[in-house]
């Protein structure tokens, strides 16, 4: 099933590791086969990895963007997820953590990434952090 991306003028996204930027008008991109696509709003820079949930999101994002080299990021992901689960008591959040782990084990990195975003939202609510680069919602896949 094709993936249709509606792009804002100048919007950047990563497509199979390449940074691509839309022109000066709105545009539509239709991907006919499987590809790793991540919109600019979903990309976290290393300097934005400042909280435990972001320490989970970042290696999942890297696994998604670099599936061939995913094992380089797995240990960091597993360590950080384990630490996070050790301090969280909310059963819904713990279920999300388990689901993230299952998605990563199945190499379903985009699904894991979108669930990881929920951890950031939970953390922001609890800790009162201002969002730092990863917005809620998303429509790339």
UniProtKB/Swiss-Prot annotation:
One of its GO terms (biological process) is mRNA catabolic process. InterPro entries: Flagellum_FlbT. It holds the Pfam family FlbT. One of its GO terms (molecular function) is mRNA 5'-UTR binding. Keywords: Bacterial flagellum biogenesis, Repressor, RNA-binding. The keyword Repressor applies. Belongs to the FlbT family. Has a post-transcriptional repressor function in flagellum biogenesis. Associates with the 5'-UTR of fljK mRNA and promotes its degradation. This is Probable flagellum biosynthesis repressor protein FlbT. It comes from Caulobacter vibrioides (strain NA1000 / CB15N). The lineage of its organism: Bacteria, Pseudomonadati, Pseudomonadota, Alphaproteobacteria, Caulobacterales. The gene is flbT.
